C-alpha cells in the first residue's frame, strides 16, 4: 500500500480549508484517510498552518511520501529539518 501525506479539501464553495492527512494513494482526494496530522487555512491572513510534528515524522519515517504542496508546508514549519536530523542521529 503506497501511502501519501496530502491535503483533503474542506470548507464551503470559494472558501477552501484543508486538512493534512495520511491516506492510501489510491483513495479519492476527499475520501477515506488513515490519520489527520494537521490543517492548512489559505484564506486567513496570515495563512494558518498547524502540523503535529511527531505524527508527521512518524509517517515520513515509515515511508509516506508528501505531495509537493504538503512538502512545502512541512519545510516551512521545519518538520523536514527535524526528520533529517532524526535520520542522522540513527
UniProtKB/Swiss-Prot annotation:
Keyword Transcription regulation: no
Top-rank taxon: Bacteria
Pfam families, A to Z: Ribosomal_S16 (PF00886)
InterPro entries assigned: Ribosomal_bS16, Ribosomal_bS16_CS, Ribosomal_bS16_dom_sf
GO biological process: translation
PROSITE patterns: RIBOSOMAL_S16
Family designation: Belongs to the bacterial ribosomal protein bS16 family.
Protein name: Small ribosomal subunit protein bS16
Lineage of producing organism: Bacteria, Bacillati, Bacillota, Clostridia, Peptostreptococcales
